[in-house]
């Protein structure tokens, strides 16, 4: 179970949910050194992957969604470190990543649909999952993802749900009208994601359906739009508009995006760099759990998203 520290209602500032850290970091230096080594491997085959540049929106949406979820859990008095807090944080991360992905797709295709429709659709799916201790509700939306071997540390394993549910929300929607229940399904399989098991289900539902989260959601999507030029995300511009409060975590995801958008030639490459990033972060014991959760959620989405957008064709 993801164990994160939530803000109290008295000190939860949605624009600054984590204490600002110094940009100077041993861990970041090691990450930068790792990037340099990886990009020197077969440089003649490495180039910018346009599809992965689009997937950067998904990663940042999940990263920011996790940060928003931490504050939302605190605002609604959901017990710190409990299953309710984790469910709220993960739910916000799922919606943030999937909606950012859909919004980028919508903009690139010139669709007239509203992101509001996808937001309502996503909440509907999660609300239904909160009603049950089973995952049968998700079965019609299954697809057969590539088996992944990601080594998330103890306490962060449930962040895989952010990546998996990201794809299921997208595949379960009708891209031209995501508020409907039409499906886009690939090879239905009985591969269920864990249900939302928490004694705080009603609090979690209230938090996820709150105006407070909707305001944060709107801010994330709006700032992604404002920071996107010709389909490419200006990550520095985005974090200037929508800071998380952790310069260190922001810099870590920036470094990951540099490698993610240029190095991978297949999903196995993404899994490799994801595991290596996790190892670097864990071995230096410098980032706190809140920072790790944001980063790891983004990494999980980076593995799953290219599998539905066919970024390596």
Q: Residue ranges of each PLM-predicted region?
A:
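Mature extracellular/secreted ectodomains of secretory-pathway proteins
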Residues: 106-313
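Bacterial lipoprotein signal-peptidase II cleavage site
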Residues: 8-15
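Eukaryotic long, low-complexity intrinsically disordered regulatory regions enriched in serine/proline
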Residues: 67-72, 76
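Membrane-engaging insertion elements
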Residues: 17-23, 28, 35-47, 75-146
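C-terminal motif of bacterial Sec signal peptides marking the signal peptidase cleavage site
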Residues: 3-6
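Hydrophobic alpha-helical membrane-anchor/signal-helix detector
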Residues: 54-68, 89-98
């Amino acid at each position: 179970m993801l164990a994160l520290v939530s803000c109290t209602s008295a000190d939860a500032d949605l624009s600054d949910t984590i204490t600002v850290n110094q940009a100077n970091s041993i861990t970041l230096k090691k990450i930068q050194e790792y990037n340099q080594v990886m990009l020197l491997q077969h440089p003649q085959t490495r180039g910018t992957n346009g599809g992965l540049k689009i997937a950067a929106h998904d990663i940042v949406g999940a990263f920011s969604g996790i940060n928003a979820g931490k504050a939302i859990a605190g605002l609604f008095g959901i017990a710190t470190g409990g299953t309710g807090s984790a469910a709220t944080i993960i739910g916000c991360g799922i919606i943030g990543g999937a909606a950012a992905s859909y919004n980028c797709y919508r903009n690139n295709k010139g669709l007239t649909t509203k992101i509001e429709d996808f937001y309502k659709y996503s909440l509907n799916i999660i609300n239904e999952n909160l009603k049950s201790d089973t995952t049968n509700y998700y079965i019609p939306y299954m697809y057969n993802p590539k088996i992944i071997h990601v080594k998330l540390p103890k306490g962060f394993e449930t962040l895989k749900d952010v990546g998996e549910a990201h794809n299921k929300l997208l595949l379960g929607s009708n891209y031209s009208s995501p508020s409907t229940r039409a499906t886009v399904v690939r090879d239905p399989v009985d591969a269920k994601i864990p249900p939302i098991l928490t004694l705080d289900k009603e609090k979690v539902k209230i938090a996820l359906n709150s105006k407070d989260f909707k305001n944060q959601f709107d801010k994330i999507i709006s700032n992604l739009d404002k920071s996107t030029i010709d389909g490419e995300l200006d990550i520095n511009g985005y974090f200037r508009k929508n800071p998380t409060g952790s310069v260190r975590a922001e810099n870590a995801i920036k470094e990951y995006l540099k490698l993610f958008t240029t190095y991978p030639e297949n999903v196995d490459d993404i899994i490799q760099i994801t595991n290596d990033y996790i190892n670097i972060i864990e071995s230096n014991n410098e980032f706190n759990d809140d920072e790790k959760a944001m980063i790891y959620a983004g990494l999980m989405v980076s593995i799953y998203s290219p599998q539905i957008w066919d970024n390596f064709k």
